[in-house]
Regions:
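Short gly/pro-enriched beta-turn/loop segments at secondary-structure junctions
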Residues: 24-26, 140-144, 150-151, 207-211, ...
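Short coil-to-beta transition motif at edge beta-strands of beta-rich domains
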Residues: 25, 74-77, 208-209, 247-258
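Surface-exposed interaction/gating patches
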Residues: 182-223, 227-228
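Short amphipathic alpha-helical segments and helix-helix/interface helices
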Residues: 19-20, 68, 203
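Mobile-element integrase/transposase regions
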Residues: 12-24
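A generic structural signal for nonpolar/aromatic side chains embedded in well-ordered alpha-helices
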Residues: 22-23, 71, 119, 206
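Short beta-strand segments
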Residues: 26-63, 69, 78-83, 89-93, ...
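Charged, gly/pro-rich active-site loop segments
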Residues: 2-13, 90-201, 241-336
């Protein structure tokens, strides 16, 4: 297939033109990174195309930096754009980007300014009902670490048809990513949220959140997140229906269920990890545990109460993480 140079926001690249609207307008993507032991972990995040059009970027909070620290240790990451909820793009392809991550946390104030600017542009209702003095109090959430992903390989399924082989694009051999900012000094804060003791109630609940994303590690060592066409709950996990190239998925696995409103007024996540084995009728995922997650669902009042509780838990970590990077705590500033 012959591809013409991309245009628009990502015009300085030769990414396939048909994927650009998806990269620019999809509200959430599934971001996959690798643990110290090489197991994949996948979470829904907000994606952005960089202003210079050379990377696709996601972020994580300074107070919960695990997504960034995994990428700093092993820059092989993947972004799957498979949920069109709230997107203005009609009949979008499902897009998988595999690339090298560059972690940016050497300028926390600039990171926070950029996050606010991008968030208000892409999600204008994010702070629409809040006076700015309340927004400023959310610095525990708004202080950001950026993860810039340089695409090396893109797979996409036109019209979201997951039952057919994907189209494929690869960067030229000289394309690489700049190094990440230095590892912060000292030890990071301990985990702030305990995972469920029993994964089964979370798995039962997840069955109502739509088709999950199954992530395994491909033969090339890259995380491979793929949207399934359905999952059936079984005693020890799930039987997942998956199209090519996931039919032979095996090894360490992550199942990510998530949903969000068209206006991003709420979101809910369930992430389960275990072991995948290919079968004749799908991929069997034996679940070992559920990960601790932060979801915002239910009434607006309930969401506010949860944010207040979370702020109390995470605020003490803010100064510690900023100090590890030799910087003051950033100040949320209204974009001009």
């Amino acid at each position: 297939m012959s591809l013409s140079p991309a245009s628009g926001t990502a015009g300085r690249t030769n990414w396939p033109a048909e994927i650009l609207p998806v990269l620019e307008h999809t509200l959430t993507c599934e971001y996959a990174s690798l643990t110290r032991t090489g197991a994949p972990i996948t979470w829904p995040v907000a994606p952005y195309v960089a202003e210079d059009g050379r990377t696709v970027d996601v972020s994580t909070g300074l107070t919960y930096p695990s997504k960034a620290e995994r990428a700093r240790r092993d820059p092989r990451v993947a972004l799957l754009y498979s949920d069109p909820t709230g997107s203005p793009v009609s009949g979008p392809p499902t897009v998988l980007v595999q690339g090298l991550a560059t972690v940016r946390d050497a300028d926390l104030q600039a990171n926070t300014d950029l996050y606010l600017r991008r968030t208000l542009a892409k999600y204008p209702r994010s702070f629409a009902r809040q006076p700015w003095f309340l927004v400023r109090r959310q610095v525990w959430y708004l202080a950001r670490i950026w993860i810039e992903v340089t695409p090396l390989r893109v797979l996409w399924w036109p019209d979201g048809r997951l039952d057919v082989p994907p189209l494929r694009w690869e960067a030229t051999p000289e394309v690489t990513a700049p190094p990440s900012d230095p590892v912060p000094a000292g030890a990071g804060a301990p985990k702030w949220l305990e995972p469920p003791a029993d994964w089964r109630p979370r798995a039962d609940h997840a069955a109502g959140l739509g088709d999950p994303v199954l992530t395994v590690v491909g033969e090339d060592g890259w995380p491979l997140p793929l949207r399934s066409s359905g999952a059936t709950r079984v005693d020890d996990g799930f039987l997942v229906r998956i199209g090519p190239p996931g039919v032979l998925a095996r090894g360490r696995a992550c199942l990510t269920f998530h949903t969000h409103g068209a206006d991003m007024s709420g979101q809910e996540n369930v992430v389960l990890v275990g072991e995948a084995t290919p079968l004749s009728d799908g991929v069997h995922v034996r679940v070992e545990r559920a990960l601790a997650d932060f979801s915002l669902s239910g009434s607006r009042a309930g969401q506010v109460r949860k944010m207040v509780r979370t702020a109390r838990a995470l605020a003490p970590r803010l100064e510690r993480e900023a100090a590890r990077r030799g910087q003051p705590v950033p100040v949320p500033r209204r974009p001009r």
